[in-house]
Structure formats: C-alpha cells, structure tokens
Amino acid sequence: MELFDKVKALTEIQATSGFEGPVRDYLKARMVELGYQPEFDGLGGIFVTKASKVENAPRIMVAAHMDEVGFMVSSIKADGTFRVVPLGGWNPLVVSGQRFTLFTRTGKKIPVVTGGLPPHLLRGTGVTPQIPAISDIIFDGAFENAAEAAEFGIAQGDLIIPETETILSANGKNIISKAWDNRYGCLMILELLEFLADKELPVTLIIGANVQEEVGLRGAKVSTTKFNPDLFFAVDCSPASDTFGDDNGRLGEGTTLRFFDPGHIMLPGMKNFLLDTANHAKVKTQVYMAKGGTDAGAAHLANGGVPSTTIGVVARYIHSHQTIFNIDDFLQAQTFLRAIITSLNTEKVAEIKNY
C-alpha cells in the first residue's frame, strides 16, 4: 500500500476520545498481520511487546494516541437540533458550517451539520456577529423535532465526529485531512513494527497507542503504569505556526525537537541523545517550543519518573476538519524514530538516565 493510501485509511476513520474502537480495530488487524500479539490496558490502549533476548534488557515504550477531537451530545432541543460538549480542544471559529457524523448507541450513523447565521439574517439588525461558545453552536441532523430525533435513536451521550475526505495537495508535497493529530502517530507505530519485524534488538520494545490523550493524557497514565518502561517516546503531531507569522513550527522543516512544553521539559541526557542521533542519521529537524502537551507529559511522571520525549511533526490548522501536513516531514520523523530505536542498548539507556 502506498503511503498516501495508508494516510487516507487512518485519517478517514472516525474515532474520538472514549470511542477509539474503530482505530483500535484497524491497528489490531495490522499488528496481527505483521505477526504480533497485541494486548490492552484497562482503558483500551493497544500495545505489542517485542521482547529482547538480552537478559534484563531495558524496556522502551513508543506510543501514539488513537483519539481525535470530537463532541458529545449534551441536549436535544424541541426543534430537533442538538447541543454538545467538546471532547478535546476546539476553536469555536472552525466549528460552524461543517459536516459531522453522529454515532448512536446502536452504531447507527447520522449525518449532521453545524449551523451558522447567514449574513442575510443580520442585515438591518445592527448586530455584530460574536464568537460563539461551543455550547451554543447548533448541531443539526435535519429532524423535524426532538421526537423524530429520538425515533432515529439519538440520545444524550451520543458522539459527533468530523467527516472529511483525505486528499493530496496540488503540488503533491502535502496532504489535507482531518485527524493527523494523531493518526500520524498511529501510522508511525505501524511502520515501525513492520520495520522491526525481523530484527533482534538489545532492548525490549512496547509499541502501540493510547486512548483519551485529547482529554487530559489519560491513557498514557494507565499504559505507562502497566508496562513500566525505562524510556518513553510519544509520537504526536503539533500545530504549525508558519502561516500566522511565527517561525515556531514550519511545514517542510522536518521532525521536531521538543525541548519544552507546559507539561514536560526534556532531560539533558535525552536531549544529547536526540541531537547526536539526528546528526548521525542526517535527519532534518526543527526546534519546537510547544504551547500544548503530549503523552510524554503524563509518562515522565509515572513509576517514580520515566525519561520521556516526543518524536513529532507539525501540521497547519490541527483540531479542525482540514489539516495540512508535509509528506517529507513524516519521512524525516520515520527515519529519526528508526535511528533512535536501533541506537538503544543497556549502556545508552543508562547514559540517557544519568541526569
């Protein structure tokens, strides 16, 4: 399967926080196909263990997260429209005028759009449009009233997830889709598992994907406790700022070196290891000072402290229906992660942990 087809398959899957099943099923099928036996944590994270033959080998964890941002129905109005609570961070300005799918408890899929006030209805009112609260945005399934919505099985607690088509940009260098945060990571771990399938390593690897990252790094807390790694590598996507006049995160500039974010500071040993590995592997990198967090923020606080970092890329307009990301950035990150994993051994892990 070509890279674009893999990206398309993963990004078009609809799976939000607490409803990661469709992505988990996809990952499980691919893991089994590659000859691995996946196991699960208590919240639904999926991982495989590739054990080393080296006695007391260090345990290295590589984790994506499966969930994308979405919404949950909080109320159904008399006119048959819905109001919601967000699952993950949303800018209200990107929500209106979009298409979604509502998933009922029985698995029925209902097309839904978000309503915006047409300019015609504002003329002569003297009203200046305001930024709406998420709780005020109209989600409309075109039902006549609440009773008809109920007949179709719609209820409070149902999930609403963006619906889009993944496409290639005109120049062929970029892809436009939803959910690259974090189907990027999901594709990275599958590609890594395929790369490592016939390799023996001096470290034991735990590779997979967490749940509920977008609502507070919840899955990482559980999985890191369960698998007890010596080092933790999150693979995640962050927002690019290049179209907003900021050099912090630019498309086409390679994988990110994330020395700092609000929930995590990279330890000196890890920083030195990443810089040396990137230089040796001739990987294109960019320093990224993040304003948000990744699962590394939860993992590094687990089990008495786990040196952690994030192997990432940036994308424009994340947490929306239309994200733009660079194909070569993905390939640079892929090369970097492979170099990292194949460089690790007992001595190197001890060096990284020697703060």
From Swiss-Prot:
A GO MF term: metal ion binding
GO BP of this protein: proteolysis
Major enzyme class: hydrolase
Catalysed reaction equations from the record: Release of N-terminal glutamate (and to a lesser extent aspartate) from a peptide
Gene: pepA
Name of the protein in question: Glutamyl aminopeptidase
This protein's UniProt keywords: Aminopeptidase, Hydrolase, Metal-binding, Protease
Record Gene3D superfamilies: Peptidase M42, domain 2, Zn peptidases
The family this protein is said to belong to: Belongs to the peptidase M42 family.
Signal peptide: none
Keyword Metal-binding: yes
Domain of life from the UniProt record: Bacteria
Spans through the membrane: none
Binding site for a divalent metal cation 2: D181, E214, H319
Cofactor: a divalent metal cation
Cofactor detail note: Binds 2 divalent metal cations per subunit.
Entry EC number(s): 3.4.11.7
Active site location: E213
Amino-acid positions noted as binding a divalent metal cation 1 in the UniProt annotation, renumbered to this chain: H65, D181, D236
